[in-house]
């Protein structure tokens, strides 16, 4: 596959209907070197897609087509309006409220919602330029899921003779000769039933996207290609972002006719001249011509303007508690060692003095008793008194 340096080549080969190079070359249009901005593409795609919506709303009578009145207070039930009558399950049930079965929804939808979105023309063109630039990068095309392993070149340009095709079998043969039929087989393999309610709304089957054929003049080409699954047909003068970047993701596989490919410079211009077919439009330019930041920052011009790096390492000092660390305390207070030594000696002297102190015969102070001990002693004293009283009674 000759696509590794495709987007960097100044010339693109034109291929014949037999899938071989015709010998002609086309200059790579400048739009394929435009900045690729997925954020702008996604934003524009989201807003343009909203313009296809059909207004919808619930009926303004929904949930109110019954006779109901609140029972008021005093019945130990909620004050929600209740259906009148009897003899049926419906009578007495809550009505009207959004919390009731059969009631209206909260904030019923209206048809005068703001459905459409306006997008700046320049921003739309920027998104189209980004989508076209991404279609020239094989890595982005393959990441989108397109099967382009065997095609001869990216972007793929064919002769203008293709625009006069009128039969589908001619279009199928061309795709097979260009080795692009694998992408169509991928579409066939992806055909499946839609999940969800869309099956009931005439949207039963879904499938993947195939190649996008971009032409200059329709001399029967649309009828030849339109019945092939996954194929999208676009006129180069009416490029649509919703088709170039399905889902808001860049990297659509595009097949160009020669005249359409040559017309891109007139449509979008180059960085040296503005577009001929668009009024006052210039191709968006890259913010950086060289994206190698390492090379830029280490260049001599920038290094000369920078000051020398400050390599002094300032380490945080570990703070220690001087009340627990004697060495730190001595650094703060050199007398601390002497004071501590005096305190220890004084303590030793006090201990020795207590040991040498003679007993002067004075009664030692008794240790105060706790409540439990007091109660035990009091009980013993009462028992002793009772025994003495009993002995005295016996002697009498």
Curated annotation (Swiss-Prot):
Record keyword Cytoplasm present: yes
Superkingdom of this protein's organism: Eukaryota
Keywords recorded for this protein, A-Z: Cytoplasm, Ribonucleoprotein, Ribosomal protein
Annotated spans, Disordered: 352-374
Gene3D superfamilies: 3.40.1370.10
The protein's assembly and partners: Component of the large ribosomal subunit.
Function description: Component of the large ribosomal subunit. The ribosome is a large ribonucleoprotein complex responsible for the synthesis of proteins in the cell.
Protein name (record): Large ribosomal subunit protein uL4A
UniProt gene name: rpl4-a
């Amino acid at each position: 596959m000759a696509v590794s340096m495709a987007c960097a080549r100044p010339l693109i080969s034109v291929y014949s209907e037999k899938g071989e190079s015709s010998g002609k070359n086309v200059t790579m249009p400048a739009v394929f070197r435009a900045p690729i901005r997925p954020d702008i593409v996604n934003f524009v795609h989201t807003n343009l897609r909203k313009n296809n919506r059909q207004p919808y709303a619930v009926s303004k009578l929904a949930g109110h087509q019954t006779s109901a009145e609140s029972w008021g207070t005093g019945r130990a039930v909620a004050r929600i309006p209740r259906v009148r009558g009897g003899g049926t399950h419906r009578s007495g049930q809550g009505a009207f409220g959004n919390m009731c079965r059969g009631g209206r929804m909260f904030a019923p939808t209206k048809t005068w919602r703001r459905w459409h979105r306006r997008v700046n023309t320049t921003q739309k063109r920027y998104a189209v330029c980004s989508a076209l630039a991404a279609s020239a990068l094989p890595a982005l095309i393959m990441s989108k899921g397109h099967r382009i392993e065997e095609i001869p070149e990216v972007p793929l340009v064919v002769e203008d003779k293709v625009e006069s095709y009128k039969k589908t079998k001619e279009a199928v043969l061309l795709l097979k000769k260009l080795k692009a039929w694998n992408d169509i087989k991928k579409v066939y393999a992806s055909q499946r039933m839609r999940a969800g309610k869309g099956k009931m709304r005439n949207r039963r089957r879904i499938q993947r996207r195939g190649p996008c054929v971009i032409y200059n003049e329709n001399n029967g080409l649309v009828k030849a290609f339109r019945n092939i699954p996954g194929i999208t047909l676009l006129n180069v003068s009416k490029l649509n972002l919703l088709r170039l970047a399905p889902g808001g993701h860049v990297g659509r596989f595009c097949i160009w006719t020669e005249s359409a490919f040559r017309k891109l410079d007139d449509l979008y211009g180059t960085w040296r001249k503005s577009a001929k077919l668009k009024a006052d439009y210039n191709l968006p330019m890259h913010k950086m011509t060289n994206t190698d930041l390492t090379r830029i920052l280490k260049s001599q011009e920038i290094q000369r303007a920078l000051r020398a790096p400050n390599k002094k390492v300032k380490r945080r000092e570990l703070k220690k508690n001087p009340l627990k660390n004697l060495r730190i305390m001595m650094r703060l207070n050199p007398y601390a060692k002497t004071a501590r030594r005096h305190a220890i000696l004084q303590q030793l002297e006090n201990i020795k003095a207590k040991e040498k102190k003679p007993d002067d015969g004075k009664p030692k102070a008794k240790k105060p008793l706790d409540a439990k001990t007091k109660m035990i002693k009091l009980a013993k004293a009462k028992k002793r008194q009772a025994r003495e009283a009993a002995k005295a009674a016996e002697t009498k």
